[in-house]
Amino acid sequence: MCDDDVAALVIDNGSGMVKAGFAGDDAPRAVFPSIVGRPRHQGVMVGMGQKDSYVGDEAQSKRGILTLKYPIEHGIVTNWDDMEKIWHHTFYNELRVAPEEHPVLLTEAPLNPKANREKMTQIMFETFNSPAMYVAIQAVLSLYASGRTTGIVFDSGDGVSHTVPIYEGYALPHAILRLDLAGRDLTDYLMKILTERGYSFTTTAEREIVRDIKEKLCYVALDFEQEMQTAASSSSLEKSYELPDGQVITIGNERFRAPEALFQPPFLGMESAGIHETCYNSIMKCDVDIRKDLYANCVLSGGSTMFPGIADRMQKEITALAPPTMKIKIIAPPERKYSVWIGGSILASLSTFQQMWISKQEYDESGPSIVHRKCF
């Protein structure tokens, strides 16, 4: 099990993207959408080699004729058959490895249902015959990647956001807050406000176009009201985007109105605190002695923290909530899109971690519930 020549696999299963690769690498080898697509129409061409399902980039490129489904919603696997397809694709098509030869480190969202990690464990050992596996919490890995052991991680991906306070390497579960508001909701909101401008995006395939618009053109305003006035009085904030059919659309205040929903969830009709307030509430649930260390180490991670301007806005909002003399530092590493994966790569290659793996033998003796005893 502890042979040095067998690299562990690290798979970060996000709601939007799967990041996969080998422990010890500095970036994931394979990054592809967590999508399974099935044809919407009957195949008429014989010998075309049509498949009954497509995964990842192939599903994305054929999206015009497919119905796209995401098996992971809000960080929780809702469709295990599709999830198995995605893992199969990861091992055999993307990484080209035999899963029975490599230990595998999987990631999961904090506060996930226990049954979820048991099922993950079961599939790895029984379907893919993994020699060993481990399930790690995403936010903790992001903190590893930033080179810290204490801090509060705001992790926001496509399906779910969390604030996770971590002290000396331990996540503090009573203070973890979860917000079901993330990239996919922002994409849907952008679809809605673009419709108000007269552009119609409705299908699952068109949603992917809007996601691309969001990733390329959106940003977070430092002062929302001020920015709205600027947008109304001049066209300096307008940008154009070319759709796949060559039509060009113009997008103005939508560029910062969409990500603003992170700070003002009522925009989406959600009655919850914004991300700045959620971070603050999370810190306030911690012991008074460690709050200073958390304020000074607010780490952003995940794809939905990639909007330009988000770190400055967080700094401004948290400063307004915190005690006046408190030193507040927002850490936004440039590679934060992949920091969960990078943290997993670091963890799985530590020599001290090697006794933490759940081995096939232990699984055979104890069954899926072993995961709660060995992974925390």
Curated annotation (Swiss-Prot):
Residues excised as propeptide: 1-2
SUPFAM superfamilies: Actin-like ATPase domain
The entry's keywords: Acetylation, ATP-binding, Cytoplasm, Cytoskeleton, Hydrolase, Nucleotide-binding
Metal-binding recorded as keyword: no
GO cellular component, one term: cytoplasm
Catalytic activity: ATP + H2O = ADP + phosphate + H(+)
Predominant cellular place of this UniProt entry's protein: cytoplasm
rRNA-binding listed as a keyword: no
Highest rank taxon of the organism: Eukaryota
UniProt modified residues of type N-acetylaspartate: 3
Places the protein is found: Cytoplasm, Cytoskeleton
GO MF term list: ATP binding; hydrolase activity
EC number: 3.6.4.-
Main function: Actins are highly conserved proteins that are involved in various types of cell motility and are ubiquitously expressed in all eukaryotic cells.
Family: Belongs to the actin family.
Name this protein carries in UniProt: Actin-15A
Originating organism: Mesocentrotus franciscanus
Lineage: Eukaryota, Metazoa, Echinodermata, Eleutherozoa, Echinozoa
